[in-house]
Every structure is written in structure tokens, then in C-alpha cells.
Amino acid sequence: MLKVQHWLQREDARNVDLATMAAQAGLGERTFLRRFQQATGMRPTEYCQQLRAAKARELLELTNRSVDQIAWEVGYQDPAAFRKVFNKMVGLSPTDYRRRFDRRNAQQG
């Protein structure tokens, strides 16, 4: 499962589906699902969302890109869906997260 996790991190968890992940692991889809969940405690989709949210947090902290640009960069086709998922996972909207954790100003001071 580590091989798949590292692969997902390199791919930024974008445009991946169950069949592709299972193939990366050399397993059938059902076996992959079971083993992935045992290894990580999450379904593959949840794990991918976590990776994408982590990348989004980094971009919000370190860049001036708009929330929509960040949504597209981390693999969301719909910025509204990104905002909803981000808020659910992080507990703050992307805009509120940026206000609270913006590291660009801290690095300049």
C-alpha cells in the first residue's frame, strides 16, 4: 500500500480511479479496497481528498492564487465543490483558512 500512497502523492491524487490504483498495487479492485482501508483507515477517495486538501492548504498559505485557481490546480473541476469539501475537512472556508494561516506576510517580517 505504501507504493500506491507514494504514487498518489506524486500524482497529487488527481484524475485517479479505483481501477488505476488497484493496478498500481497489482491487486483486484475489491482486494485493493479492503487492504487500502486496513492500511490507512480510510477509503481511497478519502485519502485522495486528504492529499488534495493538504496541497490546497499549502497553496493558500504560500501563494496569491485565487481559491478557484487552487481548486483547479488540486484537481477539482468545480470550485464550489472544492470549497464545500475543504470546509468539511478543515473546518474553515479556503478564504478564512488563508486569512488565519497566511505565511507570506510572516516570511517578509
Model-derived features: positions:
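Terminal helix-turn-helix DNA-binding modules in bacterial transcription factors
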Residues: H6, R14-A19, L27, Q37-D78, ...
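Alpha-helical ds-nucleic-acid-binding substructure associated with the helix-hairpin-helix region
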Residues: Q24
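Nucleic acid-binding interface residues in structured DNA/RNA-binding domains
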Residues: N87, L92-T95
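Surface-exposed beta-strand edges and their flanking turn/coil or helix-capping segments
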Residues: R30-T31, E73, G91
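Short hydrophobic/aromatic patch on the recognition helix
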Residues: F32, F36, A81-F82, F86
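Key DNA-contact positions within bacterial/archaeal DNA-binding proteins
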Residues: R30, P79-A80, T95
